[in-house]
Swiss-Prot record:
This is Anti-Pycsar protein Apyc1. Its cofactor is Zn(2+). SUPFAM superfamilies: Metallo-hydrolase/oxidoreductase. The lineage of its organism: Bacteria, Bacillati, Bacillota, Bacilli, Bacillales. Counteracts the endogenous Pycsar antiviral defense system. Phosphodiesterase that enables metal-dependent hydrolysis of host cyclic nucleotide Pycsar defense signals such as cCMP and cUMP. It catalyses: 3',5'-cyclic CMP + H2O = CMP + H(+); 3',5'-cyclic UMP + H2O = UMP + H(+).
Length: 250
């Protein structure tokens, strides 16, 4: 089974040129948006993708560059189109997403809008379980280290592709993924500047064996990315708006 992924944004939280790091996954006619940051609605508009063409949104954690566009989705879907789409949320984040990120803008007691489920078909996902999002598309949540004390997740898609979302460098995990057969491709966030903070840095990723680097495509980078082309070892930088096809064949 193949997957297509179009990066509607490839930038870090503060990138202005490359937009927030959000991905549109296409599989068997289903379009899943991985994260919906502040720039997501504009990015989709520029690509000519209507929000009514999005079948579901999957959230990896609750920073604004990953959830800041959900309010616009909620209002437009409800009041302009009168429709509901699936919102896939890690079970540990369902309440925090509403209480700490969306409630201030979306709650409207006068209209009986008091919870996330009043806007979306909310599907809570447990970690370390393979979930079928759509026939032919599975997702497994992998707990990641990003911000201490805050739940954050990477994703395994179809046991084919590892999508880090936001994660600190984990040498052992990346080597294990590459040698265990759990995936064939790795899309990893990459902080270009030092020192390391809450993302893997390019220098850290360059310590990986070349065989692992060859599996990695870099995303969630700073606006200065072009200065680092040719300096990323065997790894390549993903391009904003480009559609990539990932197949089981090597």
């Amino acid at each position: 089974m193949s997957l297509q992924i179009q990066m509607i944004g490839t930038g870090s939280a503060f990138a202005k040129k490359f937009y927030n790091n959000n991905a549109l996954v296409k599989c068997n006619g289903f379009q899943l948006l991985i994260d919906c940051g502040v720039t997501a609605p504009r990015a989709l508009h520029e690509l000519g993708v209507p929000i009514t063409g999005i079948d579901g949104i999957l959230i990896t954690h609750i920073h604004a560059d990953h959830v800041g566009g959900i309010e616009e989705f909620a209002f437009r879907l409800k009041y302009k189109y009168g429709m509901t789409i699936k919102l896939f949320v890690p079970a540990a984040l369902v309440n925090p997403l509403w209480d700490h990120s969306l409630r201030g803008g979306l709650e409207n007691k006068a209209e009986g809008l008091e919870q996330l489920a009043d806007y979306f078909d909310v599907v809570a996902l447990e970690e370390a379980v393979v979930h079928e999002i759509h026939p032919g598309l599975t997702v497994e949540l992998v707990r990641s280290q990003h911000i201490a004390g805050k739940a954050s997740y990477s994703l395994l898609l179809n046991n084919l592709l590892f999508y880090s979302s936001d994660a600190r460098f984990n040498y052992a995990q990346l080597v294990e993924l590459s040698t265990s057969g759990r995936c064939k491709y790795i899309l990893h966030d990459c902080q270009l500047a030092e020192p390391a903070a809450v993302h893997a840095t390019l220098n850290e990723l360059l310590t990986l064996p070349e065989a692992v680097q060859e599996m990695i495509m870099l995303m969630h980078y700073d606006d200065e990315m072009e200065q680092f082309i040719g300096k990323s070892g065997k790894m390549s930088f993903m391009q904003q708006h480009k559609t990539y096809s990932f197949t089981e064949a090597t």
